UniProtKB/Swiss-Prot annotation:
Signal peptide bounds: none
Species in which this protein is naturally found: Oryza sativa subsp. indica (Rice)
Family label: Belongs to the Casparian strip membrane proteins (CASP) family.
Keyword list, A-Z: Cell membrane, Glycoprotein, Membrane, Transmembrane, Transmembrane helix
Pfam families recorded: CASP_dom (PF04535)
Source organism superkingdom: Eukaryota
Complex and partners: Homodimer and heterodimers.
UniProt key word Transmembrane helix: yes
Identification of the protein by name: CASP-like protein 3A1
Topological domain ranges for the Cytoplasmic compartment: 1-39, 110-124, 201-204
Membrane topology category: Multi-pass membrane protein
Any one Gene Ontology cellular component term annotated for this protein: plasma membrane
Length: 204
């Protein structure tokens, strides 16, 4: 080749363009994964599920026959959870809450298999928060209604001749009390899940 005006050989003149290789771009993920917080969320829902199932199972098994003497007259008694609307409400809400917690756990397991974030968007976090709040209040309402009936059975009615029904029916009263306790524990863990949802929302 001929020379250029500056006296340099044309083969020596050129523009060097840096090679564009595979550039690794480190971007901060838009959605925090927070493995520890995800584990806590799964744990609270699992415990809430277990407590709801126990509450339902214990109340369904609350049945007993006995007898009671009033003014020297022996009266046969039969206690069954299905005789009370409040106890039926507790069983129903425990079943629905257990189904809700189980569905959330299955969704979380599906995301874990796909290595996806536990909470994928703010809308999903709000949905979780709303659901956890609703079922926490529902379990608290059901537990309170059932507790009123259980307390009436244990203490009787004041200023009347009705006695303590738990003396001739101890198994029924004990199972009912255990079921109500599990319902309140399920409420507490659902409320804890709602708090975790708020933490997710505040960091998204």
């Amino acid at each position: 080749m001929g020379s250029i005006g500056n006296g340099r050989n044309g083969s020596e003149v050129g523009i060097q363009i840096p090679a564009m290789g595979n550039k690794e771009v480190l971007e901060r993920p838009a959605i925090p994964r927070w493995p520890r917080l995800g584990v806590v969320m799964v744990a609270t829902r699992a415990v809430a599920l277990v407590m709801a199932v126990l509450s339902m199972a214990l109340m369904i098994s609350a049945k007993q026959r006995g007898s009671l003497k009033i003014f020297g007259i022996e009266i046969p008694l039969y206690a069954n959870w299905s005789f009370s609307d409040s106890l039926e409400y507790l069983v129903g809400m425990s079943a629905v809450s257990a189904a809700y917690c189980l569905a959330q756990l299955l969704l979380t397991a599906h995301k874990a298999v796909k290595n996806a974030p536990v909470v994928q968007s703010r809308n999903y976090a709000w949905l979780l928060f709303t659901g956890d709040q609703i079922f926490a209040y529902a379990m608290m309402s059901a537990g309170s209604a059932a507790a009123a009936v259980a307390n009436l059975n244990r203490t009787g009615i004041r200023h009347t001749a009705l006695p303590n029904f738990c003396k001739p029916l101890p198994r029924f009263c004990d199972l009912s009390a255990a079921s109500i306790a599990c319902a309140f524990l399920s409420c507490i863990f659902l409320a804890a899940s709602a708090v975790i949802d708020v933490i997710w929302l505040s960091n998204m």
